[in-house]
């Protein structure tokens, strides 16, 4: 069974935007991991974010926090999880790009714009968890690319036959289904995460 190798969170705000994770990578290296934080340190937030890419929308909420409450602007947030594949077969990056919906239609079901991504690779590359170019690091600050720029980047990667890169608009039922089917190819079964 594949194991979680690393997790990267970019532009995740919580506790009514009082706390912000700008760009953090947690290295699990496929091992069991204990995360010890003080009360209010973000343990529940971390668990909610880690499960979000692997569950359907209604399972992304907890009894205390709606998933959509973390995303209050048009700037994208990223929840990225890298898996080490069995028998040294490489890695697969799974994750979400999320922002508050910019569509003002009243009958819209989703309050978020969500893109699911899946990228398979053998070794470090431009579309891996560490190098995916969704942020630019300046001398003093990190500059986050906008949602549409990232989507165009993903489209370029998807068209490149040398890359095994896929992205899905998870607000579209058919594409959401394709995304979860793609995860199943790597034995990432949403049913195991939703129980």
Predicted regions: what they are:
Residues 1-140:
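Extreme N-terminal "head/tail" segments of very large remodeling/mechanoenzyme assemblies
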Residues 95-195:
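Electropositive, glycine-dotted interaction segments
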């Amino acid at each position: 069974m594949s194991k979680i190798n690393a997790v990267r969170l970019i532009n995740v705000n919580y506790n009514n935007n009082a706390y912000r994770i700008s760009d953090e990578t947690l290295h699990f290296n496929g091992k069991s991991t204990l995360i010890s934080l003080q009360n209010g340190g973000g343990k529940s937030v971390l668990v909610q974010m880690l499960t979000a890419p692997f569950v359907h929308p209604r399972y992304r909420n907890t009894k205390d926090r709606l998933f959509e409450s973390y995303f209050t602007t048009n700037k994208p947030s990223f929840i990225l999880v890298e898996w080490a594949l069995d028998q040294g077969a490489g890695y697969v990056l799974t994750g979400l790009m999320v922002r508050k919906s910019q569509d003002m239609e009243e009958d819209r079901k989703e309050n978020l714009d969500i893109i699911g991504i899946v990228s398979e690779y053998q070794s470090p590359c431009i579309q891996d968890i560490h190098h995916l170019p969704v942020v630019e690091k300046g001398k003093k600050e990190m500059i986050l690319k906008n949602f549409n720029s990232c989507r165009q980047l993903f489209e370029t990667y998807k068209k490149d036959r040398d890359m095994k890169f896929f992205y899905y608009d998870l607000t579209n039922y058919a594409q959401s289904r394709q995304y979860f089917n793609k995860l199943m190819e790597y034995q990432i079964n949403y049913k195991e995460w939703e129980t």
